[in-house]
Amino acid sequence: MKRLTIYCLTCLIGVSPLFAQQGVTQCGTPTGQPKFPIETYQELPDPSSPSDKDWAAVTIPQISWGTIDTRYAKHRLPQLKKQQLTTLKGWRGERVNAQAVVWTGTEVKDLNFSFTDFKDKKGNSLSDEAFKAGFIRYVMTDELNKDGRGACGHRQAVDYDSLLVADPIDTNLKSMSVPARTVQPIWVQCWIPQSATPGTYKGALLVKDGSRLLQQLNLEILVSSRELPAPSEWAYHLDLWQSPFAVARYYQVPLWSQEHLDAMRPLMKMLADAGQKIITATLTHKPWNGQTEDYFETMVTWMKRADGTWAFDYTVFDRWVEFMMSVGIDQQINCYSMVPWELSFQYFDQATNSLKFVKTAPGEPAYEEMWVAMLTSFSKHLREKGWFDICAIAMDERPMDVMQKTLKVIRKADPEFKVSLAGNYHAEIEPDLYDYCIVIG
């Protein structure tokens, strides 16, 4: 079966370098905290100051349901009509969301929240595990799409203004201090159990300052008789690339250690719960050069023996794939890349006991000799592991003529290999591709 999916120009999945090295941002602004905060973190100062005139009338904390379609500014009064009840409708197995908004003219020292029980008229209830909430935190950004091109590439920082925007949902932080003249949203989610009895369930979000109730926000969940399958059963072909290397750096743990896997598990479980289908694996060193903050290492060790033949070790590759499968992502493995952005291939040279690089390109004899050896070995290994049928040799944004030369090498090594490409559409090679992610717009 062939897959044709849409390639969205989004960031690779991983932990963003929210705070750069030595406790400063990449612009050099001190963060006033360790360079890799884990449990919580201090937000950067807002370039936009609150308006004394606008905030003068806010003498006590105000709390209301807002809309999930708005990112509320941290120091600007929210433009909304106060609402103490909101109703969410969903199928069994569906996730429904709401956003509560707190804004205060005076300091709230210990803002926290909790849920009441949610029951219908017949006494049926939704489990506590169905509900979760988190403070929405603010991060620094700039005018990302100011030129309207929506593209990546070099940007002159002076041409783009900085601003603080609501972005991550912090489910680790259970309470926080809210300074005067500040907006603090709370994101609420109900993952309706598939076993829930259809009906209307009523409950509330309790917003407090310490033990003092500030506001009860009533919430109704209307559960349909229809049922959404589990994320692993969704037909939607979701492919968000993962970066295990970024996680290792941020959490300061050795690559591929048990500590590394433990740090990644909650992140990759969230990805699995979103319906992710594909494991991102790497066959070569720096397949995208240094494009990302943490460049990608190879998950396969290449060794050129003293007699000139090739050998390959798949220990890291196996550990990564088995880990991802353990969190529920197990339908496809995309392996990058036979055509890295810089056509330089790293290997361990047994004769000199050192790492070396060979520069070669599709269409050259050295390229074919090296990759036929690798893919022949890789095919054998995948078949032994039982993964061959879900594995694809993947490339990213490569020209058609380069792809045609590369496809010849793949077919020579094993004509049954699936091939994936993320890039522009070329009708000439479309029949040869199993998973084709194309750019739109």
Give short role names for the model-derived ranges.
Residues 1-25:
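Bacterial Sec-dependent N-terminal signal peptides
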Residues 8-11, 27, 152, 190, ...:
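Generic recognition of cysteine residues
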Residues 20-289, 385-388:
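Mature N-terminal, pre-catalytic/accessory segment of carbohydrate-active enzymes
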Residues 160-161, 170, 191, 201-209, ...:
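Aromatic-lined carbohydrate-binding surfaces of glycoside hydrolases
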Residues 417-441:
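Aromatic- and acid-rich polysaccharide-binding/catalytic face
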